[in-house]
Every structure is written in C-alpha cells, then in structure tokens.
C-alpha cells in the first residue's frame, strides 16, 4: 500500500485565502496518475471561474469557497464545499451555477441565506456611534460585510458586533483561541456604551 500525506494550515471559512488547503496538494499529486484529480485541481485551484465561482457584488464582496473534505465512498469521490456567497444571490442561484459548471453530480446540503442589514439602519448607526464614542474616534467608522456565520441571523434584525478590533490578533476557531485582558477591557467599555445607546434609543 502507498500512503500519501499532505500538511495544510487551517483558516476561518470566510477567509480560505489565509489557509493552506492540504486537499489541493493531494489533488495535484494524484493528478499525475488520475484524470479526475487533474480536473478537481483545475476547478478549485487554477480556474474556479470556469464553474462560476467568481461571483461578487458591491455590498458584500466576493464569493469565497473552501473544499473542506473529500472522501471515496463506494468508488465515488464525495467532496464537501463550504461557500459564502454575495447577498445579491440566493441558494437556488448558487446551486444552479454549480450544476451547470461542475462535471459531476451536485447535491445541496445545509444552506443559510446571507444576512445583510443596510449600513444606514438605526441599529447599525447606533452601534457605530457607541463604538466611536468608546474608542474616542473623531472620524465615523464604517461597518464591514464578511462571509462569517453569526447567531444574529436568529433575530428579525440583527448584526454581529465585535469582538475583533483593528490591529488585534484574532485566532478564531483555531488552536489556542484566546482573548487578551486588554482586549476584554476595551470590549467591556464598547458593549456598555452600545447597550446603553440601544436601551435609550428614541428614534
């Protein structure tokens, strides 16, 4: 028997470019012997645009994808793809694009529609005001749109608010995940301001 091992680097699902996918390395090696792995390497590494994975919009940015797992079951290769797509598309759009572009069977698994709240919504403006006040910012801050999942989707109107601050290390979902006491202290002041602003918001 021959065993092939590849070493990678984990990264948050919304920022796969910060990681190093070990599966791609295996596909590259196996592609020298098996055409199917050549195809997979070409699709996911060399030319993702060939199957429609180059989508983007102005408000939420580019689509990101991560090939999270690959197994061989009953002589079939089964791959799981984590996709974070722009808000101007929906799950049916993405499924249709993949079915047209992929040279294989595509099945839709767990899906969440993107969460987006306009930057001029009162909740967003209130939170930004609280943040700027706590941080002593003279220039108003701008919200950002990212591909990360959030429990805020459980609310009729909700947004993720922190806890990552500019310039601070944020090893989310990684080994030795942590938060410094300095970071925690700053967050306490920000959240105090935010809760107070929301409770006394008069519209």
What are the roles of these predicted feature ranges?
Residues 15-22, 33-66, 71-74, 84, ...:
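An extended, acidic, His-containing surface patch that forms the Zn2+-binding/catalytic region
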Residues 1-20:
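Histidine/acidic-residue-rich, glycine-tolerant segments that coordinate divalent metal ions
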Residues 12, 26, 81:
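Divalent metal-coordination and catalytic microenvironments
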Residues 17-21, 28-33, 91-102:
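Short amphipathic alpha-helices in soluble, non-transmembrane regions
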Residues 2-4, 65, 79-81:
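Hydrophobic residues positioned within well-ordered beta-strands of beta-sheet architectures
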């Amino acid at each position: 028997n021959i065993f092939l091992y590849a070493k990678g680097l984990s990264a948050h699902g919304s920022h796969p470019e910060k990681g190093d996918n070990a599966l791609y390395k295996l596909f590259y090696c196996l592609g020298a012997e098996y055409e199917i792995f050549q195809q997979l390497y070409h699709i996911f590494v060399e030319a993702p645009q060939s199957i429609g994975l180059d989508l983007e919009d102005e408000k939420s940015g580019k689509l990101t994808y991560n090939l999270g797992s690959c197994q061989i079951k009953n002589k079939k290769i089964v791959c799981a793809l984590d996709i974070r797509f722009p808000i101007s598309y929906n799950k049916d759009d993405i499924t249709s694009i993949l079915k047209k572009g992929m040279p294989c069977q595509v099945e839709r698994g767990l899906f969440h529609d993107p969460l987006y709240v306009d930057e001029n919504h009162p909740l967003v403006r209130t939170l930004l005001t609280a943040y700027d006040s706590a941080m002593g910012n003279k220039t108003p801050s701008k919200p950002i749109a990212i591909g990360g999942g959030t429990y805020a989707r459980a609310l009729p109107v909700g947004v993720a608010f922190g806890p990552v601050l500019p310039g601070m290390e944020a090893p989310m979902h990684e080994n030795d995940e942590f938060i410094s006491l300095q970071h925690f202290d700053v967050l306490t002041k920000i959240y105090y301001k935010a809760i107070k602003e929301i409770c006394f918001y008069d519209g």
